[in-house]
């Protein structure tokens, strides 16, 4: 075996150890942060069989997990893996994966039930669909760096009926600032964005469609002034 071959193997093992260290530190730092916000379960929400093996989008390290954070009056569900460092051999950049994680904070008390039941809840389904969209999107972080506040639409999700328009469409405002959750989090390679998700009423969705970026910003400001912020209240009046 030549010296170059030995050096190549040594370098590969070193890179693998470094990748493992950064992955573990990333997971730990995210959990430590969420523990400052509320009580984090010891277990995570994940799949028995990873969807990426069945045609689903690949997450940076392959981990597709979610966590629950219980606060006094609300519960947060958050993605946990979109900001893992890339593990594939061809990905050599020292980045924190997609550079962001999503979360939804809700006042639905049923979210405090057994963790095994959470995957059947509409809030988890909403977070899951958003996370899969981000995993599949090549430059979602760049969009948030440019616009701060974005919106997205879904169909065929079993959210409370007053958030669904006559065509079965559901609007979500992304990036409304929280008074308690930081907008960013420092991880080993770089800081990532923590992106909130807030369900919109049909009137609010129509306003965003008509007004575009300005409408999204104005609606986010209205939520701030109303002190509902980023939180999805299961029962609330439309602000438009």
Predicted segments — roles?
Residues 2-72, 93-97, 103-240:
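Acidic, proline/glycine-rich low-complexity IDRs
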Residues 78-79:
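A sequence-level detector for low-complexity, Ser/Thr- and acidic-rich stretches
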Residues 84-85, 90-98:
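Amphipathic N-proximal alpha-helical interface segments
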